[in-house]
From Swiss-Prot:
Assembly behavior: Consists of a catalytic RNA component (M1 or rnpB) and a protein subunit.
Protein name: Ribonuclease P protein component
Lineage: Bacteria, Bacillati, Actinomycetota, Actinomycetes, Micrococcales
GO biological process terms held by the UniProt record: tRNA 5'-leader removal
Organism expressing this protein natively: Pseudarthrobacter chlorophenolicus (strain ATCC 700700 / DSM 12829 / CIP 107037 / JCM 12360 / KCTC 9906 / NCIMB 13794 / A6)
Role summary: RNaseP catalyzes the removal of the 5'-leader sequence from pre-tRNA to produce the mature 5'-terminus. It can also cleave other RNA substrates such as 4.5S RNA. The protein component plays an auxiliary but essential role in vivo by binding to the 5'-leader sequence and broadening the substrate specificity of the ribozyme.
A Pfam family that the UniProt record links to this protein: Ribonuclease_P
Ranges annotated as biased composition (Polar residues): 126-136
Amino acid sequence: MLATRNRLRTSADFSTTVRSGVRNGRRNVVLYTAAIAAGEPSRIGFIVSKSVGNAVVRNLVKRRLREAGAASLREHGTGLAIVVRALPASASASWDQLREDYDAALESTLNRLAGRPQRAAAKGSAGTTQKGTPRA
């Protein structure tokens, strides 16, 4: 089980990560990864919908993905928010396939995240219009 400090728990946390993060999909999973404050512990959340299968299958997939996530948290302990969405194909995937897809998607999102320019802090754009011209 993941520690509370390493779990995404609120809808707002999930939404922020999915909207502002980078996405990478594989056959069995889609990963969304976003940078958070460097000193904060990395957090991970899982989305396993009913399209994956019945409750037994969903929980099996969730347990496997949680273990893969725990291993990645040992490597990347701070500064990341990760949302893992299981696709219907994950129901029939083996542990090795799930782990391989998870690791490949995480590596890809981390590479894309590293190449992405850091967003500047809000500078208070109240003085300009959308086109950048000064307001009257």
